[in-house]
Amino acid sequence: LHDQKLNSVKCENNQMIFTFDIKIFPQDYVGDCYKQYECYKHCDMIVEMKEESFNDYNFVSATDKNGKFEGISLSQAEFVNAINNAYTAEFIDCFANNSELKIELSVNYYNAEKQYRKYRKFSLCSVALYAEKVIWNWY
C-alpha cells in the first residue's frame, strides 16, 4: 500500500475501515509482486478494535529549520472528520507490536475548506489502534 491514496475512513461496529485507491506500476515492483496485485483497484484495511481500547490519533508537522515541530492529538470523531476532508492522504507504513497497530499517513490540507485550514501545517498522521485483528480486502 505504500504511496497509495486514502479514499476514506469510517468507524462502525468497533471497526476502523481505511479504504485506499490502488494504482501500481510494474517498474515499482519485482518478481511476482506486481502480477499479484495488478488487477486490484481498491483495498480496505479493516481494523477490528478491542473493546474499550485506548487509541491515539495524532497529526504532526514537519521539523522546521530550528528543529522544532508541532503536533495535536484528536478524538476518533475529529480524526475521521479531518482525514476524510484532507486534500490528499497517502499510506506510508504500518506495523504491529503485540496488539497495537500503528499506521502512518502522509497528509496535505493545501486546498482545505475553511474549517480544515487549521491542519495545513501538519504533514504526518500517526494512528495507534489496539486491534484484535486486521483484515485486508483487495478488490
Predicted stretch roles:
Residues L1-Y139:
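Surface-exposed, interaction-prone regions used to assemble/regulate multi-protein complexes
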